[in-house]
Every structure is written in structure tokens, then in C-alpha cells.
């Protein structure tokens, strides 16, 4: 377990995160659990699970029970922290300063119009939902031993209404 890479949180660098973030990350570090392990234990996707930790996704009542068990956090306390609705989007500065998050922003900045054009040609005039949405991250290793990040976005297509 000591060689596992674990995402941690320095709350002083993220002052806009909800108080639940510090509690969740402290328990995650104490238990030495990856998001993959936590997600498996609660029956959620690992990105969705991480989004709960960052206050960007709503935890269901079932999620709260399972997180409480997996992380060893008092259920009523965790419920008091996670029962509200997320205040999405205010947790970071814009443009992002973290290099990896900035690269994701840069991908959309550089390829956004290309994505839009191709999607419009395939689906018509509309948008890809970020609400009826799922995502996943996979690791791929090529024949030369190079690691590649494979990020999949899957959003429902929403055509614009004519009125």
C-alpha cells in the first residue's frame, strides 16, 4: 500500500472548497484509500466520487452511509456536511493555475470549436449536456511502455428548440 499514489488536499491552497472537503480528504489520507477504492466501495464512478470530495457533486443518502462506513466518519456529522446542494464552479480560480487542470482547459480552448463543428455535423444544432453526463479516466500503456491518459466524456445531446 505504501507505493500507491494518493490524491491529498492542502486546504490552504483551496479556500473556496466546502468544509466537507477537508473532512473527507483527511479521512481518505488516514485510511490510505484511492478514489478508485472508495468508488468501488460506494458503488460510484471514481470521478463522480472525487467530485463529491471537492464539493462539486451531490452525495445521495446511500452515498453518505457508505462513505461514513468506508472512511470511518460519524454518519450524522457527514450527513450534516453533505446533505445540501453543491455550489458548483466556485472552487477554483479562472483560468486554472494547476498545470493539469490548465491543460484540460487548454484542450477545450484549442479544440473547442473543432469539437463543436464535428458535433454539429453529427447531431445538428445543439449542445452536449454536462448534467446528463458521465466521464471516466483510464490508463493505457502503448507497446513502447509509454503511459497515456484516456479521458472519456459522454453527454446527452440536447438539440436547441425552435420557438
UniProtKB/Swiss-Prot annotation:
Q: Which GO terms describe its molecular function?
A: cyanate hydratase activity; DNA binding
The annotated active site, in chain numbering, is 103, 106, 129
Q: Which Gene3D superfamilies match?
A: Cyanate lyase, C-terminal domain, lambda repressor-like DNA-binding domains
Q: What is its EC number?
A: 4.2.1.104
What's one GO BP annotation on this UniProt entry?
Answer: cyanate metabolic process
Matching InterPro entries: Cyanase (IPR008076), Cyanate_lyase_C (IPR003712), Cyanate_lyase_C_sf (IPR036581), Lambda_DNA-bd_dom_sf (IPR010982)
Q: Which UniProt keywords apply?
A: Lyase
Name the SMART domains for this protein. Answer: Cyanate_lyase
Q: PANTHER family annotated for this entry?
A: CYANATE HYDRATASE (PTHR34186:SF2)
Q: What does this protein do, in the record's words? A: Catalyzes the reaction of cyanate with bicarbonate to produce ammonia and carbon dioxide.
The family annotation for this protein states: Belongs to the cyanase family.
The protein here is known as Cyanate hydratase
Q: Which gene encodes it?
A: CYN1
Amino acid at each position: 500500500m505504501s507505493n500507491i499514489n494518493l490524491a491529498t488536499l492542502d486546504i490552504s491552497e483551496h479556500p473556496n472548497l466546502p468544509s466537507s472537503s477537508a473532512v473527507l480528504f483527511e479521512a481518505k489520507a488516514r485510511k490510505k484509500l484511492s478514489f478508485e477504492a472508495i468508488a468501488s466501495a460506494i458503488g460510484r464512478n471514481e470521478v463522480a466520487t472525487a467530485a463529491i470530495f471537492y464539493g462539486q457533486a451531490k452525495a445521495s443518502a446511500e452515498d453518505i452511509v457508505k462513505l461514513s462506513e468506508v472512511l470511518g466518519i460519524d454518519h450524522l456529522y457527514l450527513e450534516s456536511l453533505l446533505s445540501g446542494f453543491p455550489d458548483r464552479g466556485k472552487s477554483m480560480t479562472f483560468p486554472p493555475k494547476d498545470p493539469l487542470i490548465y491543460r484540460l482547459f487548454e484542450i477545450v480552448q484549442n479544440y473547442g470549436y473543432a469539437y463543436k463543428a464535428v458535433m454539429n455535423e453529427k447531431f445538428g444544432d445543439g449542445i452536449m449536456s454536462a448534467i446528463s453526463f458521465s466521464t471516466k479516466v483510464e490508463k493505457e500503456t502503448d507497446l513502447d511502455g509509454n503511459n497515456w491518459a484516456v479521458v472519456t466524456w459522454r453527454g446527452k445531446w440536447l438539440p436547441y428548440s425552435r420557438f
